[in-house]
Amino acid sequence: MSINLTIDICIYLLSNARNLCGKHRSKQLHLVCSPNHCWKIRHVSLQRGLHPHKVRCKWTKSETHSCSKHYYSPSNHGLHIGILKLSTSAPKGLTKVSIRMSRIKSTLNSVSKAVFGSQNEMISRLAQFKPSSRILRKVSDSGWLKQESIKQAIRSLKKYSDKSTEKSPVPEGRNHIIDKEDDIGKQSLFHYTGNITTKFGESFYFLSNHINSYFKRAEKMSQDKENSHFQEKSELEGKKVEEGKSSSLDPGILTSQADKPDPKSSAGTMDKATSPSGTPESLPISTKQSIANFLSRPTEGVQALVGGYIGGLVPKLKYDSKSQAEEQEEPAKSEPAGSKDKTVEEKKHLSLQREKIIARVSIDNRTRALVQALRRTADPKLCITRVEELTFHLLEFPEGKGVAVKERLIPCLLRLRQMKDETLQAAVREILALIGYVDPVKGRGIRILTIDGGGTRGVVALQTLRKLVELTQKPVHQLFDYICGVSTGAILAFMLGLFHLPLDECEELYRKLGSDIFSQNVIVGTVKMSWSHAFYDSQTWEKILKERMGSALMIETARNPMCPKVAAVSTIVNRGSTPKAFVFRNYGHFPGSQSHYLGGCQYKMWQAIRASSAAPGYFAEYALGNDLHQDGGLLLNNPSALAMHECKCLWPDAPLECIVSLGTGRYESDVRNNTTYTSLKTKLSNVINSATDTEEVHIMLDGLLPPDTYFRFNPVMCENIPLDESRNEKLDQLQLEGSKYIERNEHKMKKVAKILSQEKTTLQKINDWIKLKTDMYEGLPFFSKL
């Protein structure tokens, strides 16, 4: 293939360039368009161009060269390009070619000068913006600098074009074309200058009209709508600025008014936008970007080009949605604040209910998983771990006991209790007590022991118990199924029922506690009384309790098979307007059997004694969790009725055999006060005595219960001994009066001892065995499911 071109004074002959490039891999060749400009063709790849076998090349500008008739051959590539100087004596063939290509010559000459200039010149010729036009899109600081450089290049080119037009006037036939181009350039992508139109002629005019009609076909139709839209937008922005709110559009939208230059740069652009006469021109807002902006940024792709022309519609739609949202918000603001508060409270209530439901479901699922894991376990050591893990779970979440019972936990535990491993048996007894499963009572019915509060006067109750032990020849914890105490009675209940201490040791310990605690200086006690409302040191009392009882929990005492059910009573003073009784138990209630009294078994033993003995004026009130505890004697100094209720919850089908109520002595004065008035001290004493009265409960129970069921032992003292008495002679006096009272009521004591010594009948033993097997195998043994 051969190409013969006659351009001005030089001709270039390229013989079979495809073969040469493919074989010799030529890198570049130089093409001289004029004696002062040199262009080089750089080989890129063997791609298809206009001709199916033509090599695509890239044209780049190089330095100026002068060429004559010679052969330019790139080194080591073998590409020969013939360059011949033409003259009037040129061959005929070349003259014909020159005549035929005259029109192509003129067209290519104008195209080469207009198109193949520098990048800034090309951009300036394609993007002759009006001084008042602005492109609304986000740019960085470097982008603004680039725009400023482009504007400077435009100004320099304008000056150059003005000078060139003065030197070479435009023909008259082209004047109307230039005027028409100036009018169209205000609203077109291509902005015509005199230099370009003069050189291009009709070809450039046709090309520019085609591009402008393609890219800006709908601009005139939507211009009015866009102007009205952006006018509304500016009004909305003004309102938001007044309200102190900042509005910003989506960063993905190129044509956004939210991103504006700083005041300095905006001031500079306003100065530059003024007309030569000094009057500022109006700045119409254009939502579309011209093709020159995308040519100046070669890294941007087709998506940016398309987005620049359709992006003008997005802000309008976005602002319409915002205006609708604002219209909907206006009636909502007019609603009263009370309804909003109600909705907020309802939402909080619903969220709390949802959280509770989710928590309850998770607790139930965890309980089921632990029970099923225990039922699948056969190894005794692993069973101990499973049982203890389930015990801790139920202590933390008592509401899971019902699910555990439904999952047939009790039969599994009863079968495990038959194993000979003592550790496993102790763990099983603890979790059975926690669930509320109890063994049958020891005697023919329920046997209850209750001890009143009274400080160191509790030695009187010890004298009564000593006589019962002497008559029955059994320790206290074997005589009774349930032991309950208040204040000092709780101390005796724990020592006798939980620690199984002998009576002599209990009396010695009782005297020592009295001397250690109640030996307080009067002056120091008075100061403490005014400061903490406690005459004695509560911290010392807590320290003694921790040393004696340790950190064991109440429920852990159920591991001992000989341990009866034990409870200590305190009074909660911060729940509601009236005090409420609180029961510290070493057992739990079976699911479905609800007690009327508050309480729990997850507390430590020393905490139960500390709360139950917090007598006002003697010891400071004790805070345990969210509750504030005081002495239980403030509400129930005689806990017999409470003990009966608790026993009925534990053994609902068992009869009540015996209730032994032990008092700490009472004092009855024969002195009569004035009948006209009473002193303030007397009034306060009457209130306290009525609150701590034990005889009214005794009278009521004695009249309601069957004969030989309720036995009350409370001796009358010849002297009113205070609660904090620690002198040994006074304590000896109390013991002596207690012994005299027992001697006077020896017949009554023998009756109680006889009832407590009765054994179960054969029929009761058979019933207990059947019940145990039924619970163990979920039915009668011969109808068992296993």
From Swiss-Prot:
Residues 158-180, 225-285, 321-348 are annotated as: Disordered. The keyword Zinc-finger does not apply. Expressed in kidney, heart and brain. Its EC number is 3.1.1.-, 3.1.1.5. The active site is at S487, D631. Pathway: Phospholipid metabolism. Residues 246-258, 266-285 have a biased composition (Polar residues). Calcium-independent phospholipase. The modification N6-succinyllysine is found at K740. It catalyses: a 1,2-diacyl-sn-glycero-3-phosphocholine + H2O = a 1-acyl-sn-glycero-3-phosphocholine + a fatty acid + H(+); a 1,2-diacyl-sn-glycero-3-phosphocholine + H2O = a 2-acyl-sn-glycero-3-phosphocholine + a fatty acid + H(+); a 1,2-diacyl-sn-glycero-3-phosphoethanolamine + H2O = a 1-acyl-sn-glycero-3-phosphoethanolamine + a fatty acid + H(+); a 1-O-(1Z-alkenyl)-2-acyl-sn-glycero-3-phosphocholine + H2O = a 1-O-(1Z-alkenyl)-sn-glycero-3-phosphocholine + a fatty acid + H(+). Residues 449-644 form the PNPLA domain. This is Calcium-independent phospholipase A2-gamma. It comes from Oryctolagus cuniculus. The gene is PNPLA8.
